[in-house]
Each structure stands twice: as C-alpha cells, then as structure tokens.
C-alpha cells in the first residue's frame, strides 16, 4: 500500500547517563543519523535542561528526527519520520547504537495512507 511516509518511534532504555545528558553528543548523533539515512538537513535545534536532560529536533526536507532524554532513568524517546524513499530505520538504528541502548522497543507507523472512514455506532 502506498504511503506518504514512515514514522519510527523508539523507546530506548539502559542508555549511558553521560551521553543522554551531553547536548553536543546528542546533536552530533542526530545530525549524523540524518545524513546516514540520506536526508537533507534544514534546521537543527537542541535544548539542555537543568539539572539534566536534552530535547531536540533535526528538521529534514523529508520530515524530522526528535529526542527527549531522561538521563536519571537511562531512557530516551526518539521519533524518526521520513517521507519519500528514505528508510527511517537507518537513522533510528544508528541513534540507538550511539546511545548504547540495552533495550529498545520500536514501532513503525505508515503515514498518509488515505483518510479512514469512521462510522458512528448504531444504538441497539
């Protein structure tokens, strides 16, 4: 079935505290992940929280990559959404590897497959 895009959502557990808390490392990892997948980078924005944690986004011509880290839990949530021919798993796999994730739970959603008709339930 044709889709407009693919959206990979990953829960990363058992990640290294220092990596999850290092804004420069996270930003470089995400830029590298986008480039490895063949994406064209448009904008990059990351923020470091106190006392810990990083959130950020890499906007690509084909959509986006995002992260929210919780170093105190060894946890990061990532989204990689691509349109067109790009494979989002390339970037998601690279990010999980770079963060040293011990456990990874991932789902992939096809996006833009056409509107879904939802019918109202009939009362009995």
UniProtKB/Swiss-Prot annotation:
Biochemical pathway: Amine and polyamine biosynthesis; S-adenosylmethioninamine biosynthesis; S-adenosylmethioninamine from S-adenosyl-L-methionine: step 1/1
Top-level taxon in the UniProt lineage: Bacteria
GO biological process: spermidine biosynthetic process
Residues the record lists as Pyruvic acid (Ser) modifications: 63
PTM remark: Is synthesized initially as an inactive proenzyme. Formation of the active enzyme involves a self-maturation process in which the active site pyruvoyl group is generated from an internal serine residue via an autocatalytic post-translational modification. Two non-identical subunits are generated from the proenzyme in this reaction, and the pyruvate is formed at the N-terminus of the alpha chain, which is derived from the carboxyl end of the proenzyme.
The keyword S-adenosyl-L-methionine is assigned to this record: yes
SUPFAM superfamilies documented for this protein: S-adenosylmethionine decarboxylase
Catalytic activity as recorded in UniProt: S-adenosyl-L-methionine + H(+) = S-adenosyl 3-(methylsulfanyl)propylamine + CO2
Gene3D superfamilies, per database record: 3.30.160.750, S-adenosylmethionine decarboxylase domain (3.30.360.110)
Catalytic residues in the record: 63 (schiff-base intermediate with substrate), 68 (proton acceptor), 83 (proton donor)
Range of residues in the leader sequence: none
GO molecular function terms attached to this record: adenosylmethionine decarboxylase activity
Site label Cleavage (non-hydrolytic), positions: 62-63
Keywords for the protein's UniProt record, in alphabetical order: Autocatalytic cleavage, Decarboxylase, Lyase, Polyamine biosynthesis, Pyruvate, S-adenosyl-L-methionine, Schiff base, Spermidine biosynthesis, Zymogen
Cofactor descriptive note: Binds 1 pyruvoyl group covalently per subunit.
EC number per UniProt: 4.1.1.50
EC top class named in words: lyase
GO cellular component, one term: cytosol
Cofactor: pyruvate
Family according to the record: Belongs to the prokaryotic AdoMetDC family. Type 1 subfamily.
Subunit structure: Heterotetramer of two alpha and two beta chains arranged as a dimer of alpha/beta heterodimers.
NCBIfam families: SAM_DCase_Bsu
Function description: Catalyzes the decarboxylation of S-adenosylmethionine to S-adenosylmethioninamine (dcAdoMet), the propylamine donor required for the synthesis of the polyamines spermine and spermidine from the diamine putrescine.
Protein name per UniProt: S-adenosylmethionine decarboxylase proenzyme
Native species: Geobacillus kaustophilus (strain HTA426)
Source lineage: Bacteria, Bacillati, Bacillota, Bacilli, Bacillales
